[in-house]
């Protein structure tokens, strides 16, 4: 297929280089091959990559250099841009610390001197320059952030099915994996909130394949939220994946769900000669059935119909648009009307036909479920500014006009964009803001509608754990006609709410609480030794200034015949180039894993070891750019077992200052945190103190 260049490429005065992706598809192994060989660590490779292939743009973002690399996909003939924004970190940087490191458990890492945003924007933004808010949006086709020490985060992966030349989620993910392999990244984290329509892929693929969707690229379990550990996660996977299909049919026989389930299972069992003995076998085959060509599915349906009674069965219809995304800031824009909801909107002054019912009943709920980087309180304050504009104008307002009208009172354009994208999903008192498209200009516009008392009644009855809608009364269809609907039926009625079994439902919740996954790369340069050098502060500094876990060592490449003296020089150069706190650090000695000091003239290779400790002086203990998680020490000790920030909503005890999950303390997501909060221990101490005072009196 011929390469199709987009407008931004052809408008360039100088023809830029195009990096052709010859194998832009899933490779046979789970680890994708590099584009080409770079023989250095990430901090050096990223510089070489930019120097060789990138074109520097004529604008900056908050002083950060923006470069563009053009890539050509031979899979679908598309040339697309990869923007790389290099942020130099200093005390004056707008966002020098990393919230993603803090939430992932890397808050003890030293603050790096450079970090690189790697962005493939949406297709309709390829001709536009990036903006400041581009660094916080999660609607890009791809957005990754990598620190110059090689640790990074995959923030989002999205697909645009409306684009005929769209890049699939698998293609984008394969590109990202190969890019990381090429540049020699060390570890990449991600927050897995990927979905297929209404289904969480980490649950669906976890049961079907024993791994999340990202597991195809070797992303492995890191830690769970709410204190979930690795062994509990794997037990939950095993519990659900090993459910026997015959047991399901037996336990549900005689029920309406059982009859529907049997028709689905009989069809797919009749479509293969392989025994579909377990739920894992069944779901894996059904997921493969989706990828078959329509003619193959129709043939299978005809063959099965010859051996089975042809029946229709009820199932739940759902949006079949696929979206795969990740990060603490993920956004999803689904404007389809969800049939089956019984929420009624009512505005006596305007028509309400086709208005989408609200998905959330508070901004706290929206903030949590849409993974907003802004708390519910800020979203609510911003929404009030939007309502004020509607009250002043009393008319339908275009998106651009509304955005400009609230900028003076809100200021944060990223917050404005996020709110306008999701505001139609939330009730604001007895009103809701409707998004629609102007039929003439085709531009997005907003209007304010009033809802009736029935919605308010639904809001009062809404509980935290809302079970999925019963699906036995929904639209009829035929097994195999829509494999997605067949899978969704099993997902809703087996994985989420297995009848009369708390064991299986709890196992599903354990898997859903596990969103943090990580991939680690390892490599060794040819004709060089690559060793890890970890800074070891002196005893006084450890007691006074470096109370957290020491960050991992940095990779240092030296010749194979290097001595300890040469390693000292190379390590000092690497540390000064990488971290703010080691900018003036001088290496005095190298120690082995047993903390034994090594002589300068000793051959490095003779040590038979690749991990060393580095001691010296010159650590900048006065800088606030010490830890990626921030300068302040704070303690998490929740009753669920969590001992670190896991990205979930928390509240600090006003007495002991220890942080706890709000949900673990009966504070619902749509509830405000009380003005005074005491944890169970401090509350008990307070009661005992009051009793003592009363007894003394």
UniProtKB/Swiss-Prot annotation:
Which lineage ranks, top first, belong to the organism behind this chain? Eukaryota, Viridiplantae, Streptophyta, Embryophyta, Tracheophyta
UniProt biased composition (Basic and acidic residues)? 339-349
**What's the protein called, per UniProt?**
PHD finger protein At2g01810
Task: Provide the residue span(s) of the region labelled Disordered.
Answer: 319-362, 457-478
What GO annotations for molecular function exist for this entry? zinc ion binding
Q: Which PANTHER family match?
A: BINDING PROTEIN, PUTATIVE-RELATED, PHD FINGER PROTEIN MALE MEIOCYTE DEATH 1-RELATED
Question: Any one cellular component term from GO for this entry?
Answer: nucleus
Alphabetized InterPro entries for the sequence: Zinc_finger_PHD-type_CS (IPR019786), Znf_FYVE_PHD (IPR011011), Znf_PHD (IPR001965), Znf_PHD-finger (IPR019787), Znf_RING/FYVE/PHD (IPR013083)
Localization annotation: Nucleus
Q: Where are the transmembrane segments?
A: none
Major location (coarse): nucleus
One of this protein's Pfam families, by short name? PHD
Organism of origin is Arabidopsis thaliana (Mouse-ear cress)
Give the UniProt keywords, A-Z: Metal-binding, Nucleus, Transcription, Transcription regulation, Zinc, Zinc-finger
- Which residues form the PHD-type zinc fingers? 635-685
Q: Which PROSITE patterns match?
A: ZF_PHD_1 (PS01359)
